[in-house]
Curated annotation (Swiss-Prot):
InterPro entries given in the database record: DNA-binding_RecF (IPR001238), DNA-binding_RecF_CS (IPR018078), P-loop_NTPase (IPR027417), RecF/RecN/SMC_N (IPR003395), RecF_2 (IPR042174)
A GO term, aspect molecular function: ATP binding
Classification via NCBIfam families: recf
GO BP, sorted A to Z: DNA replication; DNA synthesis involved in DNA repair; double-strand break repair; SOS response
CDD domains: ABC_RecF
Family statement drawn from the similarity comment of this UniProt entry: Belongs to the RecF family.
Compartment list: Cytoplasm
HAMAP family assigned to the protein according to its UniProt record, in alphabetical order: RecF (MF_00365)
Stretches assigned to coiled coil: none
Organism annotation: Streptococcus sanguinis (strain SK36)
Protein name: DNA replication and repair protein RecF
Amino acid sequence: MWLQSLKIKHFRNYQEADIDFHPGLNVFLGQNAQGKTNILEAIYFLALTRSHRTRSDKDLIHFTENDLLVSGILEKKTGKVPLDINLTPKGRITKVNHLKQSKLSDYIGTMNVVLFAPEDIQLIKGSPSLRRKFIDIELGQIKPVYLSDLSNYNHVLKQRNAYLKANDKVDETFLTVLDEQLVDYGCRVIRHRLDFLQKLESFAQDKHWDISQNLEKLTVKYLSSIPLHQIDNLEETYRFSLIISRKRDLFKKNTGVGPHRDDIAFFINQMDANFGSQGQHRSLVLSLKLAEIKLIESITKETPILLLDDVMSELDNSRQLKLLETISQDIQTFITTTTLEHLKNLPQDIKIFTIQQGQIMSQS
């Protein structure tokens, strides 16, 4: 798939822009704080209905306005697909083929993107919530039912936590009813995640082995607050874990076990990647991103769109070459950069946009 055009209105520092893209490589060139990353953010937003930089939709709207529009024409194997997202004071409207979508899970997955940004290094060093977010975003693109199951789980979890906080003495029967719903949706979420990570690990191992010149074996482990030694009896194990945790939950007024507490661990040659070098961390993240591309291709039979936010300067020559090998293949890529110095080995057939103060000054 590839994005033919993008129209943005009242998005960040752009009052309005209408851009036609190259099916291969598109480069946004400009100094910092001019609006390069905002275009990548708009593309990401068009795909996933959310920003990778902020949790607040208000941050995306131009400071002089109270609404925004992001729309694009996506080219897939089945033909052209118009996409629209409109943020207004009354809420969000998403459309596919000009038809309003009632649920986000009906919209997300139409356009697949893989984002690689400098802050992705925090996947290894950051908090567990960042790694859960990574799973949720990537898995949600390729398996819409996951978003539905996760949403239902979070709804019951919020209901349970609110009940615990509001009552010093609880109705054990009512709590058991909530627990059964948590077990149902929680087990679905865990099984989705395990299946996703098993497939991602397979692709990432091959990529990391190649990048490390056959020296490092990468493994990915799902760390669950629910024991996973008998996956066929997961519901029973989950139920028992909630019973064991109930005294703790009543005291702390929240839920101590479940997929909202889970994490991922990365190992290089069986050693915790947390203790690896910065170079190993960059190789690991690059391996994951390249694996995402392969995984999305294998499931959707479409090539995702690659977004590279000022990452070339973060990579050494060998890692740049591995990334460039992917770019040179049949994948639409968007790159932001302050200089073309790091892009000497890119294909000649590219489109360069010069960005200045929220304006596209030139195209070549």
